[in-house]
Amino acid sequence: MTDSIPHIPVLVKESLSLFQDQHPTTFCDVTVGAGGHAEAFLTSFPSIEHYDGSDRDLSALALSEKRLLPFKGRVCLRHASFDEVNALTPDGMYDGVLADLGVSSMQLTDLERGFSFQGEDHPLDMRMDTSRGITASEVLNSLREEEIGEIFRKYGEEPLWRSAANAVVHFRKKKKILTVKDLKDATSGVFPSYRLRKKIHPLTLIFQALRIYVNQEGAQLKVLLDSALRWLRPGGRLAIISFCSLDDRPVKWAFREAEARGEGRVLTKKVIMPTYEETRKNPRSRSAKLRCFEKSLKISDE
């Protein structure tokens, strides 16, 4: 880990605008990362007296701790997943909750983490929390072909999931898949020439699938969507930034269903996406989508 802060937060102005008329005093950032959004919120809203920032990535927390030193006394950082945050959070605690889903550019550029195609000789890890859990390498070397194929299909929506799973199992009979290069070699004959000519790397969906499975991102997102409204005070707002349809779809439907139940209203009737200027400066932002839900002011009789 370096002392620099390479991660550029996305949709910052748009995220701030969703809380502009609210003047929040308590805020929860469940993916604080390197502290980019936190810095923007704490600077823009002097009204925030208590900002809880959590993340599964200890390296990111170390960076955010340095970045947020000017706001000492207003910030509390903790190493926690969504389910752990839920266990710690009482009802009606926050005016706002923010989640920035997916992998960060900081994690991608740290080749030791195994998230990037570029780190060929680096271990195929992919854990956001390197202190626990199984690695992508362990998944590929231990699960049955059918299980690996299901991961590629369900979490990557990879059209060639059967062929890719078969290639992995065939390769590991001769050599364990331990590095990024091993996975590339294992699947080298899977993709047709038109996939190889595209700008998007042919292994993109496979990497996505492994990352989501290793980090149980779907289960963690479900915890967030099932619980975050409970954390909010009446009139509080939940903003979620997603980067792929597997994340955005559940968010969209959860917000719609909560609105239908009378729990509040969707503030982003049209999903918010980055401007051309932002995507030019930060290409990673191009697939970002921001949605926001406001909890009802009405207090339940239950």
From Swiss-Prot:
Show the GO cellular component annotation of the record. cytoplasm
Q: Which domain of life is it from?
A: Bacteria
Q: Where does S-adenosyl-L-methionine bind?
A: 35-37, 55, 82, 100, 107
**Which is an annotated GO molecular function term of this record?**
rRNA (cytosine-N4-)-methyltransferase activity
**Cellular localisation:** Cytoplasm
* Enzyme Commission code(s) on record: 2.1.1.199
Enumerate the UniProt keywords alphabetically.
Answer: Cytoplasm, Methyltransferase, rRNA processing, S-adenosyl-L-methionine, Transferase
InterPro entries, per this entry?
RsmH, SAM-dep_MeTrfase_MraW_recog, SAM-dependent_MTases_sf
Principal location class:
cytoplasm
GO term, biological process aspect, one:
rRNA base methylation
What family does the entry list?
Answer: Belongs to the methyltransferase superfamily. RsmH family.
Q: Which NCBIfam families match?
A: 16S rRNA (cytosine(1402)-N(4))-methyltransferase RsmH
What is the designated name of this protein? Ribosomal RNA small subunit methyltransferase H
